[in-house]
Amino acid sequence: SELIKILLARPYKLKQGFLDFWIPTYFYIKKQEYSLYGANGAYIPNVNMEFFELLQKHPGDYSVKALDVSGVRMDIFNQYRKFLNVRALGSVTNDDFVETIKPFFFFYSHQLNTYAKHTRKFNHEQTARFRDTLAVAKDPEKTFFEDLPEALGFCKETLCDKDKVEEFCYVINRAVRELRSCYNDLIDRIEASVLDALGIEVYEYSEYVKIIRDRFSSVNEHLLTDRLKEFYHHVLTEFDNRKEWYQSICYTALEQPLERLRDDQEEKLVHNLISMFRECEKYSDISRMNACGNDGEECF
């Protein structure tokens, strides 16, 4: 709207009808040279007909900023592209910028589950800062050239050193790896606690799950509470992979999907799991004793 006011006033004194045609046309022609932002400051990656219609109706809702990728920013930008395994560039258009940043937002939005978006159980604090910066990003240019380097401990002056720029890329690689593995790391910790509590020294899922099922196969379900019966059914259900089995048994102990677990709930979850396994062991012993008694045999 400020641009329109300037063009309507002296010395330009352009007509509103002309501006309604010229401004969208100019923006379309120059769309590779600027970044566009909406009313709430959110970045708009694609310019389409719907945008032009809204621009004519509500010009004050939008702002533009020239895309500045030069000097140190170009080095940082090409490190992002190196991470994505795409070729380095000597100059950057808006399409190049969108192509480069889009995978990072897709990774956060679509490849991280709820647990990964909230946990802080990482080997490196930079991992949580990397994720949290993506989570609140509105201005991608500021996010990728200012906020992320700062969050990961790299100031503007430091990044003038090309070795530091490469180190910055390494930290991002490491953060992505830790984010991808954190949910499996959670299951690893739960698995270790369960096997230790049950005294099982076999660590291959396909093997130890058979031991657990055999141990509890004699339980008389009529002795179990509703909650324990639900847990018992989850324990005995056959799953092809470890992840699904742990998600299943944890659902009863947590009373919500495992991926919604928060860090301060992990200790209680493990405690509840072990308690329910102990209960199942107790009722398994009782059921075997009853079976032996009915057969007139002595049980040990």
State each model region's role:
Residues 4-44:
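Charge-enriched amphipathic alpha-helical scaffolds
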Residues 35-86:
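C-terminal engagement modules used by replication, chromatin/transcription, nuclear envelope/ESCRT
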